[in-house]
Amino acid sequence: MAESTVRKGHQKPLTSEVALRGKKLEHGDGEVVIIGGMVLDIHATPSVRANSGTTVPGKVYYVRGGVARNVAECMSKLGAKPFMISAIGFDMAGNLLLNQWKSAGLSAEVGILKDKDIETPVVCNLFDINGEVAAGVASVEALEKYLTPDWILHFRNSLPSAPVLMVDANLSHPALEAACKMAADMECPVWFEPVSVTKARRISFVVEYVTFVSPNEDELIAMANALSGCDEFQPLKESQKKNISVMSLFQLLKPAIWVLLENGIEMVLVTVGSNGVFLCNKGGPRHFKKHTEKINRTGFGGQLYKAFMQKNPPSRSSGISELNKSSHLFAVHFPSLAASVVRLTGAGDCLVGGILTSICAGLDIMQSVSVGIAVAKAAVEAEANVPNTFNLSAIAEDAKSAYSGAKVLFHQSML
């Protein structure tokens, strides 16, 4: 088991400042800017085990999806008002997405390109009887064709006041680069959502601009290989993960995580299914701090902040000595929460949506990840990618469980 540097009498708070490239992540009157896909998901779920070559009874649902859209909808239902940049058509799928977007009180007048020539992105997923994706077909070419650098740059004036820009990897290489360079010019931190194993490799085009990434295990491996320039890392086999301890799983993923941190990414958030989440940075607990003097705690964001702080102490002593060295990998493990699983597809997006909303409400990164895990729990218990409503009290209570269960997993030199 890896040693952590713990000395009694020299304890430092684990949760305070998040050091971000360019500027501190603060919230005034700005909105999170989100660029990426608005997609209609078709979910086919058999009621018995599916057989090749024939149909089986089950249910087929039309679900509003797309990583960026899911994150934005989640944030809106948590009280934030993100600014969305995307593209859809005037077809059935586009109308379904647009009508829901307007009903959520979000603006569709600017940011979302609408054109009769656009075929709205559609993804069809076939699930197994356990709720896991068994196979899928994605028709999302319109995102690369119509979400162009020119369209994105129309909205550069939205970034100066934005606390963060989130991009999903559905964007083409030129569009990703344009968005991230635009953010860098405005000193706006960038959150990169990898979307899929194939598209996760697009991190190599923009890594110098990225502050946060949120891959799952397989996406992490793909990103590390893309940044290494070779297939140095192999995806974990199911046999490797069977009955494995959290520490052993982290040790398997640690070299890939370090590649991302060595390439300048400041925070790596790895989702590991039922094993929870790893939050990793390069340095130590000092880099988990965040100034909150200018946070605007009004509206629902203020309620979220108050609800969390009532359930949890304002700071937690971790017993970690202050080894702020660039050669040190610092990792915290958050456990998953027990849930009555209906569907797993929206969990990761709601995790990110919960984290972003919480940061903007004034919670630090540890607290925000705890809220994100609570929001993800609510997502897996719903049929839709994003639940119709969130219960603030339940979110705060579940966040308390995630927060109290967080443990420092690793704090050691990588030299």
What are the roles of these predicted feature ranges?
Residues 183-192:
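Short beta-strand/loop segments at the ligand-binding rim of alpha/beta enzyme cores
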Residues 220-221, 277:
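A generic structural signal for short hydrophobic patches within well-formed alpha-helices
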Residues 87, 111-118, 123-164, 169:
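Conserved phosphate-binding/catalytic loop of the ribokinase/pfkB sugar-kinase fold
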Residues 1-34, 199-200, 226-415:
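Conserved phosphate-binding/catalytic region of the ribokinase-like
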Residues 2-104, 123, 130, 135, ...:
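Glycine-rich phosphate/adenosyl-contacting loop at the front of the ribokinase-like
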Residues 194-209:
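Short, glycine/polar-rich helix-capping loops at beta-to-alpha or helix-loop-helix junctions
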Residues 59-60, 85-90, 107-120, 193-195, ...:
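Beta-strand->loop->alpha-helix junctions that form or flank phosphate-binding loops
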Residues 210-220:
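Non-cysteine beta-strand/loop elements that form the S-adenosyl-L-methionine
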